[in-house]
From Swiss-Prot:
Annotated residues for binding of [4Fe-4S] cluster: C275, C333, C336
Catalytic activity: (2R)-homocitrate = (2R,3S)-homoisocitrate; (2R)-homocitrate = cis-homoaconitate + H2O; (2R,3S)-homoisocitrate = cis-homoaconitate + H2O; cis-(homo)2aconitate + H2O = (2R,3S)-iso(homo)2citrate
Coiled-coil region list: none
Transmembrane stretches, start-end: none
GO terms classed as biological process: L-leucine biosynthetic process
Biological source species: Methanosarcina mazei (strain ATCC BAA-159 / DSM 3647 / Goe1 / Go1 / JCM 11833 / OCM 88) (Methanosarcina frisia)
Keyword tags: 4Fe-4S, Iron, Iron-sulfur, Lyase, Metal-binding
Descriptive protein name: Probable methanogen homoaconitase large subunit
Annotated disulfide bonds: none
Length: 391
């Protein structure tokens, strides 16, 4: 079907490709400047002259097109910036030139990622062709135990489903454990839907959603829900009580194990941040583990946005983290994509709160273990992978 896109996003890593394709189409003006969002987050600030020049070209194009929703370096990661600024709305179609654009499904939007050429088509017409995906229903009954977080739940589901188990499916999340997740936790969950192959991940909007969007939504919205008698290609039911702290081991996101099975693994670096776990709630969890203590390995913390950083400063979270010996970097993607601000050396091991641990992701010969902020912080204290329940 040919669908009308409500909001389109491309960041500094993909917008230049989309802009070049747009120009090759000999288009002069975008379909609607107010519906395009351009954040600089992937290599921000620029790490080379080449990156700086490409960013300069994007800024010039943004000015030429009179695009008002441009977010400079330091404003934050695209998948945090869009929700904070009210673009992620229930019932809307959001498309981003980034695979983790499915994050916005946490607000009841249909959100997905596309390539730069498809984004150029959206820039030009505001439309894009989609194959309507079949749906999976995942229900998580009961409540998560103390010290078990949204990231643990997410990794557990990916481990059960596999990296291709939900390929091109719309995965809908239900159950008490899902309802009890904060908005930030739901963003973590939907952010990683792509890691099981999903086209999108969706949490039905509720009062938590609407409260978050008060005084924030950029437009009126109408929530959309599945019919009570909707049929699904597959349905899965899990018990939240079965979930303990999880770790995704190198070099696949679905290589998931309970933390106890990898406890004691040597760690060279800990990274807490990214579009998966760089929100205020995540920093607060890390601070609760590190308060009054000192990290024993280099620990990099990168808030997901400037607003997140300011909030963490205001409520004392950042002071706790800095006193614990962490390194603070500019809000953005940081070393997640292996470009700057903490890439790994040969054979080094990192516990990261990111969403991918592929070989070469943070350095060609590094090893990445994905975990929650609590597990990451606990590991920063001991210098080895550690169960946060023991701290």
């Amino acid at each position: 079907m040919l669908a009308d896109v409500d909001y389109a996003m491309a960041h500094d890593g993909t917008s230049i490709l989309a802009v070049n394709a747009f120009k090759e189409m000999e288009m002069e003006r975008v379909w609607d400047p107010s519906r395009i969002v351009i954040p600089f987050d992937h290599i921000a600030p620029a790490n080379t002259e080449t990156s700086a020049t490409l960013q300069k070209e994007i800024r010039e194009w943004v000015r030429e097109q009179s695009i008002p929703n441009f977010y400079e370096i330091g404003e934050g990661i695209c998948h945090q910036v869009l929700p904070e600024n009210g673009f992620a709305l229930p019932g809307k179609l959001l498309v981003g030139a980034d695979s983790h654009s499915c994050t916005y499904g946490a607000f009841g939007a249909f959100a997905t990622g596309v390539g730069a050429t498809d984004m150029a088509e959206i820039f030009a017409t505001g439309k894009l062709w989609f194959k309507v995906p079949e749906s999976f229903r995942m229900t998580v009954e009961g409540s998560l135990d103390k010290h078990v977080y949204a990231k643990d739940l997410t990794l557990y589901l990916i481990g059960k489903t596999g990296i291709a188990g939900a390929t091109y499916k719309a995965v809908e999340f239900y159950g008490q454990a899902i309802s009890e997740l904060s908005v930030a936790g739901r963003m973590t969950l939907c952010n990683m839907a792509i890691e099981m192959g999903a086209k999108t991940g969706i949490v039905p909007p509720d009062e938590k959603t609407f409260d978050f969007l008060k005084n924030r939504a950029v437009a009126p919205y109408e929530p959309v829900y599945s019919d009570p008698d909707a049929s699904y290609l597959k349905e899965f039911v899990y018990d939240a009580g079965d979930i303990e702290p999880q770790v995704a081991c190198p070099h696949q996101v679905d290589n998931v194990k309970p933390v106890g099975e990898v406890e004691g693994t040597h760690v060279d670096q800990v990274f807490i941040g990214t579009c998966t776990n760089g929100r205020l709630e995540d920093l607060e969890v890390a601070a609760s583990v590190l308060k009054g203590k000192k990290v024993t390995v280099r620990t990099i913390i990168i808030p997901a946005s400037r607003s997140t950083l300011l909030a963490a400063i205001k409520n004392g979270t950042m002071e706790i983290l800095l006193k614990a010996g962490v390194t603070l970097a500019t809000p953005g993607c940081g070393p997640c994509l292996g470009a700057h601000q903490g890439v790994l050396g040969e054979g080094e091991v990192c516990v990261s709160t990111a969403n991918r641990n592929f070989k070469g992701r943070m350095g060609k010969d590094g090893f990445i273990y994905l975990a929650s902020p609590a597990t990451a912080a606990a590991s920063a204290l001991t210098g080895e992978i550690t169960d946060p329940r023991k701290i």
